[in-house]
């Protein structure tokens, strides 16, 4: 046994663990996966939908407050009107925008949700590469109601900055991606409730970071019936802003999958030859089209590429208008819908908060976060699924094993991870975990598997410095340690149905408590938590997993572990 433990401390097993060598990031070139059947895809889509909502801090949805819409400052022009808008998407928090409506066209109209990317002037940007007012004006003239609204931190929506989400906020799933997605969901509520809108005919379009908002919204909200995301669905770049990169968003996935989630609804993918969508016609579009084929709906997807740098320019807009006309207006000749000249309004005539203040009771940034936490605490019912989502856990892969004497190396099939332990006797039913890994000091008298989890003891390995948005694509070290314990549980369970016990000390007691909570089989838990009480500071100091407090934290884990 001492020799086995010595070997464990000497073998370079960490070099074999893909979690140290295959570290995806926003500029990784991903390979689209193929689902064999529609049923396979629907199962995966349902999980991805929950993953998006979990990463956004929106699982479950916050309680929807009254929108209290303020619509004012109406301007009437040739064929359309423009109004300023403020809506309350959370109590005391307001989203600003402009409402463009057709004039001289009675009845209910289809509507277009129109967020924006990282243009300097946001929803009011006007330049050759993108004219957001021009887009909205032309759509309104063509017969749509258009709601152009802000990113967080832009124009009229500045109660938070655009860039936020410190580690404590991450524990509660509070960040710009989630707030923007919630704003979009509430924007759909607002538009669908307008008396001149046909809520069964809603579309959405935007470019760049706005396109990210579009495909995430469309992925989780089936009320959007037609989507035109521009210059963003890519296998080689996943987004460069915090508002596109919440922790946990892209565990085992990337933006092409989010584009696939629009199927079988009509989708137009507009790409550019001069940005990260340059390969669309040969790589990403065929991948998305394969999903439409599963639905027997390949006629619903179209694609075009514009020879230009990153944009939503005139050529891109003129590709978009006929697509919406075909699917939302049911126009007889959709190809005739093209952009016409337009006049811009002054910024003061467009900004909702020009010479105007937010409604009484509007909150500050710290107050918004405090309210987010309070609301989340009312939704802390123990849920194994919610915890598993923030950890990115896998309990379905087959666990394989190899042995070298008393050394046991576990790996999940297709994952490339390596979890090392020492069996102190035949048929162990006890898993022992210590923060420093398997050592003689923690050996019990009974047959046990002494586990060395990820980046502990001699399994510590040098890795590349984390790239931007590391936790968007990769589990935290603590989450990986919990996965390793679950992998060991699954391994022992496959050997025998006899009961399994977890014995864990010091910080490893926290790992084991969460592993027991999410284990698909009941385990006996011997894991004294000591001074760890599950406060925000405890998680920041000893056990960092973004979203863990939003998913129920320690109280949920304890309730589930003792079920």
Language model region names:
Residues 16-94, 270-429, 436-447, 454-498, ...:
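Alpha/beta-hydrolase-fold serine-hydrolase catalytic core, especially in secreted/extracellular enzymes
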Residues 189-251, 488-562:
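Primarily recognizes the serine-hydrolase "nucleophile elbow" in alpha/beta-hydrolase
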Residues 7-15:
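Hydrophobic h-region of N-terminal signal peptides that target proteins for export
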Residues 106-193, 199, 232-243, 427, ...:
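Cap/lid segment of the alpha/beta-hydrolase catalytic domain
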């Amino acid at each position: 046994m001492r020799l086995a433990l010595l070997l464990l401390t000497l073998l370079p097993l960490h070099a074999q663990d893909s979690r140290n060598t295959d570290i995806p990031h926003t500029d990784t070139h991903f390979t689209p996966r193929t689902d064999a059947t529609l049923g396979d895809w629907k199962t995966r889509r349902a999980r991805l939908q929950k993953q998006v909502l979990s990463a956004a801090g929106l699982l479950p949805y916050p309680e929807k407050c009254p929108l209290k819409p303020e619509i004012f400052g109406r301007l009437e022009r040739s064929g359309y009107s423009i109004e300023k808008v403020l809506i309350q998407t959370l109590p005391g928090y307001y989203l600003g925008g402009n409402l463009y409506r057709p004039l001289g066209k009675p009845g209910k109209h289809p509507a277009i949700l129109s967020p924006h990317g990282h243009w300097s002037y946001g929803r009011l940007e006007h330049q050759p590469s993108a004219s957001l007012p021009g887009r909205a004006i032309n759509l309104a003239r063509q017969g749509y109601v258009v709601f152009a609204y802000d990113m967080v931190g832009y124009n009229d929506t500045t109660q938070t900055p655009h860039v936020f989400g410190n580690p404590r906020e991450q524990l509660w799933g509070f960040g710009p991606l989630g707030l923007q997605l919630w704003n979009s969901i509430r924007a759909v509520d607002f538009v669908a409730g307008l008396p001149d809108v046909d809520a069964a005919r809603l579309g959405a379009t935007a470019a760049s970071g706005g396109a990210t908002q579009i495909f995430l919204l469309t992925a989780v909200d089936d009320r959007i019936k037609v989507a035109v995301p521009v210059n963003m669905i890519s296998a080689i770049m996943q987004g460069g802003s915090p508002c596109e990169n919440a922790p946990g968003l892209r565990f085992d996935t990337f933006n092409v999958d989010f584009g696939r989630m629009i199927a079988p609804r009509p989708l137009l993918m507009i790409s550019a030859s001069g940005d990260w969508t340059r390969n669309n016609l040969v790589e990403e579009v065929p991948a998305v089209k394969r999903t439409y084929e599963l639905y027997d709906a390949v006629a619903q997807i179209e694609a075009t590429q514009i020879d230009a740098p990153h944009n939503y320019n005139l050529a891109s807009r003129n590709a978009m208008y006929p697509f919406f006309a075909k699917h939302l207006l049911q126009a007889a000749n959709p190809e005739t819908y093209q952009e016409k000249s337009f006049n811009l309004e002054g910024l003061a005539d467009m900004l909702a908060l020009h010479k105007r203040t937010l409604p009484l009771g509007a909150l500050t940034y710290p107050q918004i976060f405090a309210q987010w936490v309070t609301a989340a605490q009312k939704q802390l019912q123990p849920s194994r699924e919610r915890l598993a989502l923030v950890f990115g856990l896998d309990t379905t892969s087959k666990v394989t094993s190899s042995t070298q004497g008393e050394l046991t190396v576990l790996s999940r099939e297709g994952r490339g991870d390596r979890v090392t332990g020492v069996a102190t006797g035949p048929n162990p039913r006890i898993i022992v975990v210590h923060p420093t890994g398997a050592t003689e000091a923690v050996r019990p008298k009974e047959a046990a598997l002494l586990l060395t989890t990820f980046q502990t003891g001699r399994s510590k390995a040098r890795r590349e410095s984390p790239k931007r948005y590391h936790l968007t694509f990769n589990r935290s070290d603590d989450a990986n340690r919990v996965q390793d314990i679950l992998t060991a549980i699954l391994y022992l369970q496959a050997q025998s149905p006899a009961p399994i016990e977890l014995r864990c000390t010091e910080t490893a007691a926290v790992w084991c408590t969460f592993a027991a909570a999410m284990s698909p089989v009941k385990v006996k838990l011997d894991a004294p938590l000591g001074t760890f009480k599950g406060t925000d500071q405890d998680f920041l100091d000893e056990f960092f997993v973004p979203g863990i407090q939003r998913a129920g934290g320690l109280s949920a884990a304890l309730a589930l572990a003792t079920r």
